[in-house]
């Protein structure tokens, strides 16, 4: 069983140097050994769905060998319980703000089946030919399903070798777009004036931005994102998108997706991108693979999937295609010259409607959202550790800020570009510190090269 990560001082304070003492070792210390932070964001899975049976994690309870996570099923008029699914493809459930409120059910975490409503879209009915393959042995909807090491062996192998985060929460109780806005800016909002950051108000129900771009409303996000601060500090970054990242007009034009705002690629919609002229830093997956091989990755990288390898429920390809995609990305970094100075963080943008038993903490009116899987993969990761700290995408921003920006926060009071965000989440006491997941004094771990299709 993996040991929990303790929130205590991990090393004794160093005594002051004395005359005649050996010289201190040269070279970077602590997080400054990390020159490359890489964030891979997949789609729509809850923690219990992927890691609910992982030993030592805060997962699904079992009684007499059977899952005890049973909730009301209004269609069958009885309680339905979790079940192990060996499927590759899933239906999932609604994953918007209304569904989140229903799922959480005031903290009881009992509304996941009720949120399905009725009909075939989410297989609430479960009797149609289309839905027959998406139900459990007792006719449970697949939002109650969980997978194990057998179905996603590489993800579990990364958890065994590195760090599994069992209190990673989606940043908001919404879907892909607000989650990715939080990923790069710490906020999700709509703005009355794209040139006035103070005109923005919190909004986690946003529609696809490219529908607005089609009518010339660009840019549309006026508040400050992390790339603006990276630019001010001369820190390199890249946001790597895949074909299919943008699925609405005008993205039907070949080659337009990377520079058109979309749910998984919001940066082109930020005013700051035009103020700093950084549009060319939005690249494609081939660019990431080349840079990882040649040792030219930027300091900060985000990698988001296309439709077919996203793990999104309802995709024509399933979770193993997504796992293969992620494994190829990780393998490329591990085989390249930058592995020794890299940290790869893997997460999923929202819960996809799947059951999770942990009530999300309330931090502000925008979240947190439901729990999602999280992993750290790095030669300096505390091997075989489960991190029980409370985390969200804000912890990614905090680590970027601490490593590359001297601790400068996305704080409108201090970052030189005021906006109207209600909270600066990186400063909240509840938020854990990703730096505690590393052991920089231990011998760095060698690469763990995995078969993408085991």
Language-model segments: residues:
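Bacterial N-terminal signal peptides
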Residues: 2-11
